[in-house]
């Protein structure tokens, strides 16, 4: 392999890696992973208008973000989302970020444009 071929393949590998790494923060559905500190600022500024807790009822009853709406991933529907404007910022959260991402993607699938999620539990944004 000559130097030009090596650099070509190294560049391609780097681009592919960077692309996949970026998907962690920007999914194809239009949702976005944000830090807890950014979420706090966006809630305070009004950029995020709704906080949706997608955890189970047991987890919700144990504690939740003040003013959050309880909507587990399996009950997210167009009907349940009717009270939200499709241009409002929505933040989903759970305990680890996995269900929050699934919930965010489900909400975005109903045409919501500004849907964010965080890794970690609600207490990280208190």
Where would I find each of the regions flagged by the language model?
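Catalytic cysteine-centered active loop of the rhodanese-like fold, especially the PTP/DSP P-loop
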Residues: 77, 81-126
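Short histidine-centered beta-strand/loop micro-motifs
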Residues: 61-63, 81-82
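Flexible, polar/low-complexity N-terminal or interdomain linker segments that lie immediately upstream
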Residues: 1-50, 54-62
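Short, structured coil segments at secondary-structure junctions
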Residues: 64-66, 111
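A broad detector of short, well-ordered amphipathic alpha-helices
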Residues: 37, 66, 98-102
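Conserved beta-strand scaffold positions in the cores of enzyme catalytic domains, especially
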Residues: 51, 68-70, 115-117
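Non-transmembrane, membrane-adjacent beta-strand/coil modules in membrane-associated proteins
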Residues: 73-74
